[in-house]
Amino acid sequence: MNVSIEIGLLVSAFLIFCSILMSKTGYRFGIPTLLMFLLAGMLFGTDGLGIQFDDVSVAQHIGMVALCIIPFTGGMDTKMEDIRPVLSPGVMLATSGVFLTTLFCGLFVYWVSGWQLHTGVGFTLIGSLLLAATMSSTDSASVFNILRSQQINLKHNLKPMLELESGSNDPMAYLLTIILIQCLQAGGVSGWEILWSFLLQFVVGIAGGYLLGRLSVWLINRVGLKNAELYSIMVLCFIFIIYCSVYLLKGNGYLAVYIAGMVIGNSRLFKKKEIGTFLDGMTWLLQIVMFLMLGLLVNPHEMLPVMLTAVLVSVFMTFVARPLSIWLSLLPFGRKITNKSKLFISWVGIRGAAPIIFATYPVMAQVDGASQIFNIVFFVTLISLLFQGMSLSWVARKLGLTEPLPEKEDNFGIELTEDVGSTLREVLCTEELLQRGRHIRELSLPEGTLVIMIKRGDRYIVPNGSLELMLGDRLLFMQHGCQHFIETLLGICAAIAFEQAARI
């Protein structure tokens, strides 16, 4: 049936709109937003309201675009000072953790395939490992979204470690998936070929991501565009240039865009705030489209025959394969990472869109059992998002790994672009501060430091040196540079609490 472009746009917009409304309902009950998008697609799909979508190729290509932009945005939001202490364990989790999860889970699937479950599910050893490989990585979109939407403040640098793992482990899962598909199609691949492929993918991916990221920063800061909105479009172009260039050089494009995102996000960048806002919007749109599309792609009635196998695999992966892989991967770090932290890392093995996208590769390659692989991976993803996603904050609290969120109230709504090179701090006027002086000129502020605005109740005051301060006033300081400013304020009063920090 031919559908006009107007009808197609109307249906697409309506689906996205309904998904957003469903996500609001799910948020009230603690259901992950991305799970609601997935369920919305299933509701409107073939077994629901009857919208037919069965083009695996289109789903794979849209997923590829999403898996370029989402990790790049996550990389831009990752601060090097946060991940530097957890860089080594994060890399171990993203490499050996994925490999061990594939090995343990693949052997379990092969063992289960020998059971007489009357489900029609049966895999060879390579096929079992392929199924495990497609879902061996945690999903960056799901982990970034859940950690940030639930506003969990984790101890022991766990949040940057988890975001580093989820942002950088897709390349390993992708590589294992491709190699195992080649093994099934060609009848075998030599060990040297596998080792060379691993080295080439990671070395070219890391080097290409870093070098092209540095080149992107240099070009953005020097191009001198008259229209500020074009900088965001330029960054979007760089994302795809980086991915495709590294891919053509036989490197891992997904790893490259994540590395490039970290390089760009941790550099002085013209219009960084505007670029970040644009990419955040793009990330949300792609997450909605990707999960909604994957929900439309699956036929729930086809998952019923594999349901028992999928549940067994999900339970084994969650409670055996993932924890065992985490413990073994983190052995070199001894007691630096506590057992409670390892337990929580094991629980945050959330599956999402990436495993489902990787499960489309066997379908496109037409390997034996590809449809079963896709349906099992989809079912495991549903279980993971539902149980692990919903219980994330509860598990963190039970393990004693949370701490109160720092207050981030913004009373002034003022942000500075990075090229200004100044720092804003919001400070509460306390008794201790008033003991140093009741007027601004008595505070002995260093050169270059100004009180640019005061909030008193509901009033905003542009102060001068003779203004008398009152208990409860909120002072907005501005100073060029950061460290000297912090030392100055600490010198004024050790009891002052910093409530707002904005340095872009």
Question: PLM features: residue spans?
Answer:
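Transmembrane helical cores of multi-pass secondary ion antiporters/exchangers
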Residues: 1-409, 418-419
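Short beta-strands and strand-coil junctions in structured, solvent-facing domains, enriched
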Residues: 78-81, 270, 300-301, 436, ...
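Short, solvent-exposed amphipathic alpha-helical segments in soluble enzyme
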Residues: 362-363, 400, 443-445, 468, ...
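Charge-rich, low-aromatic oligomerization/scaffolding segments with amphipathic character
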Residues: 396, 471, 484-491
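Long, charged amphipathic helices and adjacent flexible linkers at domain junctions
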Residues: 404-424, 496-504
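Cytosolic Rossmann-like ligand/nucleotide-binding regulatory domains
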Residues: 433-482
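Short, compositionally biased
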Residues: 467, 487-504
